[in-house]
Curated annotation (Swiss-Prot):
<keyword id="KW-0812">Transmembrane</keyword>
<dbReference type="GO" id="GO:0022900">
    <property type="term" value="P:electron transport chain"/>
</dbReference>
<keyword id="KW-1003">Cell membrane</keyword>
<feature type="transmembrane region" description="Helical">
    <location>
        <begin position="263"/>
        <end position="283"/>
    </location>
</feature>
<dbReference type="InterPro" id="IPR004338">
    <property type="entry name" value="NqrB/RnfD"/>
</dbReference>
<dbReference type="GO" id="GO:0005886">
    <property type="term" value="C:plasma membrane"/>
</dbReference>
<keyword id="KW-0285">Flavoprotein</keyword>
<feature type="transmembrane region" description="Helical">
    <location>
        <begin position="296"/>
        <end position="316"/>
    </location>
</feature>
<feature type="transmembrane region" description="Helical">
    <location>
        <begin position="68"/>
        <end position="88"/>
    </location>
</feature>
<keyword id="KW-0997">Cell inner membrane</keyword>
<feature type="transmembrane region" description="Helical">
    <location>
        <begin position="25"/>
        <end position="45"/>
    </location>
</feature>
<protein>
    <recommendedName>
        <fullName>Ion-translocating oxidoreductase complex subunit D</fullName>
        <ecNumber>7.-.-.-</ecNumber>
    </recommendedName>
</protein>
<feature type="transmembrane region" description="Helical">
    <location>
        <begin position="211"/>
        <end position="231"/>
    </location>
</feature>
<keyword id="KW-1133">Transmembrane helix</keyword>
<feature type="transmembrane region" description="Helical">
    <location>
        <begin position="124"/>
        <end position="144"/>
    </location>
</feature>
<comment type="similarity">
    <text>Belongs to the NqrB/RnfD family.</text>
</comment>
<dbReference type="GO" id="GO:0055085">
    <property type="term" value="P:transmembrane transport"/>
</dbReference>
Length: 348
């Protein structure tokens, strides 16, 4: 009898890229739904435009490279990138912002480096930074939460603002009663004007609590989605735990040392894109460290950078910059923190 000798692995597990992407997209849907509830249909429209742009851009690049189109589009990595860009952009921002950002993410950051698995930076965060430095006013003017808006904007109103030139011009100037700064931006501005954190938190945008109106529930929804990813073993805990833990510890020290000039740990954890970053952005396996201890350090680095940028930097939310800086350090982390050889105990 002839025996066939095959190389390892001898036991295989079905973990196709498309299945992983589907689970991540599914886990992000509660956060998307809560964002739409508080900030209107604009978020949903931005996501739809981003997805259509991502698929078209990737198909065009693949055709130019003489690569098969259908298998690459079916892995849904472009859809996930587009989803992350769509939820990160202000809901009523002009349509060309999401188109520019998505094309840059897919063409320049992903395909120019060789496609899926070859990119050095997180495509969604690279696109966000490009838009932030190119259109700072548009990217920092968010729709007012539905609980604070003077009037409720329907889907047709959102389409009119996003796609019409007049609506885009009005949005750039700030539509009275419809658009406003984010809680992070409001707190940062108030602190620079000499107000205490406690005085700033009394503004209507904070909803009378310790977090921004609506943003607590958005972050809680992304946290629930992240727990689903952990439960299904789609992601491992190291990066998320390192990020949340480091941000909590830094916030605790800052708040304990000077509560008048520093936000509380609860505010930092449930404001901005903290939970989205912890479970859906920083955990990108392509641009993160690979070893367990390396991933823990990678996540902690992002958490510390988020806190430093939010507290001392020029931007209210430092998630995108923190992730990109950590992406740069990922190869260095892998070089110095190597996984234990198989058979050793004590690895994380």
């Amino acid at each position: 009898m002839a025996f066939k000798i095959a190389s390892s692995p001898h036991v295989r597990k079905d973990s196709q890229t498309s299945a992983v992407m589907q689970r991540v997209i599914l886990a992000a849907l509660p956060g998307l739904a809560v964002q739409c509830y508080f900030f209107g249909w604009g978020t949903f429209i931005q996501v739809c435009v981003a997805i259509a742009t991502a698929l078209a851009a990737e198909a065009l690049v693949l055709k130019l490279r003489n690569r098969p189109i259908s298998p690459t589009l079916m892995d849904q990595s472009a859809v996930l990138t587009a989803l992350l860009i769509g939820v990160a952009i202000p809901p009523l921002a002009p349509w060309y912002l999401v188109v520019i950002g998505t094309v840059f993410a897919i063409v320049m950051v992903k395909q120019l480096y060789g496609g899926l698995g070859q990119n050095l930076f997180n495509p969604a965060m690279a696109a966000y930074v490009l838009l932030l430095v190119s259109f700072p006013v548009l990217m920092t003017t968010w729709a007012a939460p539905s609980t604070l808006a003077q009037s409720s904007a329907g889907i047709l109103d959102a389409i009119d603002v996003i796609f019409s030139a007049q609506g885009a011009a009005d949005f750039a100037l700030g539509i009275d009663g419809v658009s406003m700064a984010t809680p992070l931006d409001t707190l940062k501005t108030d602190l620079s004007m000499g107000l205490t954190a406690d005085e700033s938190l009394k503004r209507a945008i904070f909803g009378g609590g310790s977090t921004g109106e609506g943003w607590f529930w958005v972050n809680l929804a992304y946290l629930c989605g992240g727990l689903f990813l952990l439960a299904t073993k789609t992601i491992r805990w190291h990066i998320s735990g390192g990020l949340i833990g480091a941000l909590f510890v830094c916030s605790l020290f800052g708040f304990g040392a000077s509560p008048d000039t520093h936000a509380s740990p609860l505010f930092n954890l449930f404001s901005g894109a903290t939970m989205l970053a912890a479970f859906f952005i920083a955990t990108d396996p392509v641009t993160a460290a690979t070893s367990p201890r390396g991933r823990l350090l990678f996540g902690a680095m992002i958490g510390v950078l988020i806190y430093l940028i939010r507290t001392f930097g020029g931007y209210p939310d430092g998630v995108a910059f923190a992730v990109l800086l950590a992406n740069l350090c990922a190869p260095l982390i892998d070089y110095y923190i190597k996984p234990r050889a198989y058979g050793h105990r004590g690895s994380l």
